[in-house]
Amino acid sequence: MERIAIIDGNSLINRAYYAMRNPMITKDGIFTQGIFGFLNMMEKIKKDYEPAYMVIAFDLKAPTFRHKAYEGYKAGRRKMPPELAMEVPILKDILRAMNIKQVELEGFEADDLIGTIAKEAESCGMEPLIITGDKDELQLATDITKIILTRKGVSEFDLYDRQAMMDKYGFTPTQFIDFKGLMGDQSDNIPGIPGVGEKTATKLILEYGSVENLIANVDNVKPKGVKAKVEEHAQLAMMSKRLATINTQVPMDIDFAEYKLTEPDYDALIELYSRLEFNRFLKKLNVQRSGGTGSGDPAAKPLAVDAEKLEKVCVREDSQLA
């Protein structure tokens, strides 16, 4: 089963940026620590998991369907610092030079694109690996789809599939959405039920299974204080669950042949690495270009594209979702 690495671009560069104690700045004043950490993370993923395919999903500034459904969605979240904002377009240039596909779509978050690609990949017989620092994406875990969640900066990860979710939380990845619907999410300003925290939300999910079933059986809820909260804020819980649910049916074209890892544009990449003063990456790239393998990174090996195999890989156009 071939693997596809689906990376949450905004989440990972943000974590990489804040993981560095001291800023990295070139002599020309370009901040680079977010890019540097992101590239290190990509190297680790390629080395440890050897994906045949890779795609990076990014958020756009435009409001999404969640902002339209709830005006307060993500209100109060701190803005990206200008130093990090400076790094994002440079990272995208590097990814283009690497011939790694990037996806973004107005009206949707990167989470939704990731969920849609992962679901399609699994249906095509691939093994999706979702790399993120966002716990929201744990709801996408299955027996096949794995979530690689950054634990400390971007150098340490926890791996989740459906069973790992059950072991840690006691409920399924799908029920993780109900869990967030009850307790909310401060980082996204999803309200949940006021006064219901992690412990109570877990107890209610384990007992009733879903927000809908909890509301339908509210007369049986104990203690009375929790019952009163559920009765009063039932609609808020339902809205919160909708906000927390990742859309896995985004109308987008998916052609896995475009996600195949291939050789980079060496000249473009060397120019970018030189400007960013990434000497270690430059040295490794030169070894790769001369036919070496760098430090054992499978991405440094020429990846031949099997045309016959690619013809069998799913290609989905958004018109097929009608």
Features from the language model and the residues they span:
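Noncatalytic, basic helical substrate-engagement surface that gates or grips nucleic-acid strands
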Residues: M1-I131, K135-R162, L236-M239, T245-D253, ...
